[in-house]
Amino acid sequence: MARVTIEDCLKNVPSRFALVHMAALRVRQLREGADLLIKPSKNEDAVIALREIAANRIVLKNKSDKKG
């Protein structure tokens, strides 16, 4: 994937707001040392997070999905 676009990400996320939230959480995880879910690159953490979302490597979980 040469360039990641918002439209690529929105195919896997229900809204732009959810996309921003997911990307921000993933950037935090990456900065704390989480493993990459895509091929390593020299991109910034935000771009890596968006690429992972566009590649459908990250999924949005609903609060109602939690058991307990």
Swiss-Prot record:
Enzyme class, broadest EC rank: transferase
Biological process terms in GO annotation: DNA-templated transcription
UniProt cross-references to InterPro entries, sorted A to Z: DNA-dir_RNA_pol_omega, Pol_omega/Rpo6/RPB6, RPB6/omega-like_sf
GO cellular component: DNA-directed RNA polymerase complex
Signal peptide extent: none
SUPFAM superfamilies hit by this protein: RPB6/omega subunit-like (SSF63562)
GO molecular function, one term: DNA binding
Family membership: Belongs to the RNA polymerase subunit omega family.
Protein name per its UniProtKB record: DNA-directed RNA polymerase subunit omega
Organism expressing this protein natively: Desulforapulum autotrophicum (strain ATCC 43914 / DSM 3382 / VKM B-1955 / HRM2)
Gene assigned in the entry: rpoZ
